[in-house]
Every structure is written in structure tokens, then in C-alpha cells.
Amino acid sequence: MKFSQAVIALAAATVVSAQLPDVPQCSLPCFLDALTTDGCSELTDFKCHCSKPELPAKITPCVKSKCPVAEQVSVSNAVVKQCSEAGAPVSIPPVEESSSKPSEPSTSEAPTASPTESTPAPTTPAPTGTGSPSGTGAPGGPSGTGTFTNTGVPTQSTPIYTGAASGLSANIGGMGAAILAIAAYL
């Protein structure tokens, strides 16, 4: 019995991953649970899933507990896109930066604390110096004299571009989720 449940979970995780390739791996268990228990007859019937008003309310807390904020935004965008393409647009509240606890209702009361001034931290000037090279080089190697001046101004390096390979991790992640689903049911 457990083996058949594992096979079903694997198939469902694979379908969810294939249908929602932009969804981060951390959220796949949330979708798997929500999409297999919402009463829709097929896992890939996103028009049915998206028409269920409880879908965002069921997936959101799970995603908040399993994914970092950046990936929560990706999940939100993917759900809105998938539901719109299926013909059943949904509205999902924006992801809050501090997702470690549930948001509390806002009030119209005035703030109780007043702004304070802060003193900037003292700065230490960057060291500068001049120097002359000394020593001898290898025979036949470069030679000469010169000076070195340190301006104390740091330079910024260019960030690494991951290119199209960054999208590959989402598809590979789906297989990882499928394997985890099998392990959970065994």
C-alpha cells in the first residue's frame, strides 16, 4: 500500500514540477498537498484549482514556512501567471519582507515613538603610501624602476552572470522533490 502511495506521490510531484517550472523546489510539497486535496478531478486542471477561493489561503502559510522571502515572491508570481493563463485569475497579497511571523492587522493609530537623531560612526581614512620597488629580477626578465601609490579607493568587481543555467535548477529541483516525496511515503 505504501509503495502505491509513493508512486502516486512521485507522479504528482513530477506533474506539478512540469506544469509549474518557475515554482521553487521548497514550495512543491505545498502545491502537492493543496492541489491533490481541493476536489478538482485532475492535477493539471489549473482552471479548477485557481477557481477555488481557498487555494491561496492553503498554499500561502505553507510556502511562508518552507521558503525564503525571495522564493515566496517567485511562487506568488508563478501562481498568478499560471492561473491567468488557465482563465481563472487570482489575486495574491504581496509577500512581506518579514515573513517569520503572521502579519497583524494594521491600525490607523499614530505611532507612539518619535524619530531620533543618530550620530554617524567615525570613519578612518584609508592608508596611502608610496614606495619604491627593490630587489633584482631574473636574468632576462623585466627590469626597471617605479613607484607605487595606494589611493585607498576600492574597486567593485562585476557580479557573476549565471545565464540560462539558473533555470535548470528549478527542473532538477522537481526531481529532488519527487525523490523526497517517495522517501516520505516509504
Swiss-Prot record:
Residues 89-159 are annotated as: Disordered. It is a lipid-anchor; GPI-anchor. Disulfide bonds join C26-C67, C30-C62, C40-C48, C50-C83. The keyword Membrane applies. Residues 148-159 have a biased composition (Polar residues). It comes from the Eukaryota. The GPI-anchor is attached to the protein in the endoplasmic reticulum and serves to target the protein to the cell surface. There, the glucosamine-inositol phospholipid moiety is cleaved off and the GPI-modified mannoprotein is covalently attached via its lipidless GPI glycan remnant to the 1,6-beta-glucan of the outer cell wall layer. Residues 96-131 have a biased composition (Low complexity). One of its GO terms (molecular function) is metal ion binding. GO terms for cellular component: extracellular region; plasma membrane; side of membrane. InterPro entries: CFEM_domain, Extracellular_membr_CFEM_dom. Residues 132-144 have a biased composition (Gly residues). A lipid is attached at G163 (GPI-anchor amidated glycine). The CFEM domain is involved in heme-binding and contains 8 cysteines and is found in proteins from several pathogenic fungi, including both human and plant pathogens. The CFEM domain adopts a novel helical-basket fold that consists of six alpha-helices, and is uniquely stabilized by four disulfide bonds formed by its 8 signature cysteines. Belongs to the RBT5 family. GPI-anchored cell wall protein involved in stabilizing the cell wall. This is GPI-anchored hemophore ARB_02741. It comes from Arthroderma benhamiae (strain ATCC MYA-4681 / CBS 112371) (Trichophyton mentagrophytes).
